[in-house]
Amino acid sequence: MIVLICLGIEGTAEKTGVGIVDSDGNILAMAGEQLFPEKGGIHPRIAAEHHGYWIPKLIPKAIDEAGISYDDLDLISFSQGPGLGPALRIVATSARTLALSLNKPIIGVNHCIGHVEVGKLDTGAVNPVTLYVSGGNSQVISHESGRYRIFGETLDIAAGNCLDHFGRETGLGHPGGPVIEKLAKKGSYVDLPYVVKGMDFSFSGLLSAALREVKKGTPIEDVCFSLQETAFSMLVEVTERALSHTQKDEVMLCGGVSANSRLREMLKVMAEEHGAKFCMPEMKLCGDNGVMIAWLGLIMHNQFGPLDIKDTGIIQRFRTDEVEAPWVNNNDSHLKLPDNLIAKGAESDIIKSSYLGKNAVLKSRIPKAYRIAEIDSKIRKSRTKLEAKLLSDVKKSGVITPVLYDVDLENKSILMEAIEGKMLKEVIDDNLAYKIGVEIAKIHSLDIIHGDITTSNMMLRGGKLVFLDFGLGRHSDLFEDKAVDLLVLKKSLQSIDNTTASKYFDNVLEGYAESYGKNKDKIIEKIKEIESRGRYTH
């Protein structure tokens, strides 16, 4: 088989990278330069100037390091998006110029998928749940039905952006992450908001609260410790939810924030608690680099061939789930459930039990070793208490939930009716999707948010839907919260092929609209608004 050599150019934000890789996965060269702003964050124009200066210098450097000539190149690959518009344009222009001058084929690739694929190359992971976290991106990604799917993402700013912003505002400098990590080792916990909405996280409120603590005079070490622990606990929890939903047996960490040893430790502990393998590429491959662009270019060229030069424009908001990825090996290796459990969710063990001679299940919110005790105890107690209340409150709408037998706040557990039926993800069809929409509308009409509506948290018993697991539930009349609730369900449908999943969600919205009432259109519009937000443009 002929071995091809690809040169990749990266420049979505502040890091310029050029890498050379062959189709056997050998890294032949890796060169890069990072922009360090004198003050403030990364300005798109300054980033573009940085790339314009360094790309012409790094290309010959990489060629020399690889010990090859320009004629030996078989393909030019570049990061097509997502990223800063001016920066992406410099990268694309440089790649086109090089490809045309050498008469070589060209291909543009998705930056986020580049991180995942180079991570798999380096670690040997086959089909992991990946936490990709950087200055501009925070996503939980896993491959399902021919594409990389985003199971969780930020609803506002990225985790790395949160840390960098805090660093700038408090005079710690940019990037903020390394300084925050150092100061956090000397700090103690102060209470900060913990915001997980279904499979998504939000960092803007956490950032604002942390800055307020600094202005109040709280020791900077304490704020750094609390900011880091809270932000990373949110990231790991959502990754854990995706792992529980997909039942994959590999967890991978990548992106610039993976330089933080505490985040690596937390994710590794979580993976081990589920019996999953933890993977992380070597540090030089975690941040933005040209190697990942070259490697993904080779993969996509092998699958689809090169791009026509007219199709090499940038895609500033290039979503991970827009790319067909049929090359991924969806192996049959999954998590193995311990013998004593009926199920193991993201935050609870489900144990077979009984109550007055009736079949029952005990939902036990077990301590999470990756979280500090202050955060862990607070979350487990508040969620247990609220879930018990919501299980009862939601019945007023006519929605079926398990009968509640006992609540033990000290041990953070709930004893409830055992539901004999089938998980919805095993039996969903058009008609059931419509019924789901009707039932969700009933719940929302009471201003109750389920918080984690997935096909794993609904069952079909005797032809009727039963809603489970209100652990992330709360009361809210906000259209945004109701829209996010529906989007959680949409993401959980991603294990089905795109066309069918889209059809099912349309049926859900049809049932929802017919049942909800006068504000249904505002909620459905809010769904579109949330989906259109620029979460990948730094």
From Swiss-Prot:
PROSITE patterns, alphabetized: GLYCOPROTEASE, PROTEIN_KINASE_DOM, PROTEIN_KINASE_TYR
Region (Kae1): 1-327
InterPro entries: ATPase_NBD, Bud32, Gcp-like_dom, KAE1/TsaD, Kae1_archaea_euk, Kinase-like_dom_sf, Peptidase_M22_CS, Prot_kinase_dom
CC cofactor: Fe(2+)
One Gene Ontology MF term: iron ion binding
Active site (UniProt): 452
Binding residues for Fe cation: 111, 115, 132, 288
Cofactor: how and how many bound: Binds 1 Fe(2+) ion per subunit.
Locations listed in the record: Cytoplasm
Family (UniProt): In the N-terminal section; belongs to the KAE1 / TsaD family.
Name of the molecule in the record: Probable bifunctional tRNA threonylcarbamoyladenosine biosynthesis protein
Species, as recorded: Methanobrevibacter smithii (strain ATCC 35061 / DSM 861 / OCM 144 / PS)
